[in-house]
């Protein structure tokens, strides 16, 4: 089965149990599978107080928006050329076309499929994720990602994957990570829109992945 057909079958069952369902996952299956390194970004929930019923994959395919997705595009650009040191001057200015180009090859999904507001209400998030645990496990397994980046969701995904007792490693600069059940690295990192000086947020992740994966 293709990735898209597996997503469709999973979401068909899942959306019956979750109001205002927002679809997500692999943006372009061909680009994802052709990638030397399959990248998966795990987020909490979409910010849409108006309600769901739309597809994050299409939103990303059209370039998404600068908040959140500029930094993910920067991460992807650096990871696709990890042996090089891309200067900040090459990353500082991001436009819609750049995001479209960089984001086509990724997988991006939210643990909570119903939308929330600007900030996550932890109690609501925890309750929904607990109810949808098996669905989330199945979705993650579809992608067989080489590198997973948890964008403020690392400890949540670790629990969902029943890896609470697995070892958590730390890079020389203090970035934590663990291995999933396929022995692929999962990085516990900040949300891409975190209030951190942007170059530090961008290069902090790249340095960690370079240390672990090269």
Predicted regions mapped to residue ranges:
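Surface-exposed cleft-lining segments at the edges of enzyme active sites
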Residues: 54-63, 78, 112-129
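Ligand-binding pocket scaffold of soluble enzyme catalytic domains
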Residues: 22, 31-34, 85-95, 100, ...
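Short, contiguous, well-structured surface segments enriched in hydrophobic/aromatic residues
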Residues: 99-112
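Short mixed-charge
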Residues: 79-102, 166-181
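C-terminal capping/extension of enzyme domains
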Residues: 2-12, 122-137, 156-214
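Active-site and ligand/interface coordination hotspots across diverse enzymes
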Residues: 1-80, 135, 139, 175-182, ...
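Proline-aspartate-enriched helix->loop->beta-strand connector
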Residues: 136-153
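Short, solvent-exposed loop/turn segments at secondary-structure junctions
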Residues: 45-49, 112-116, 153-157, 191-195
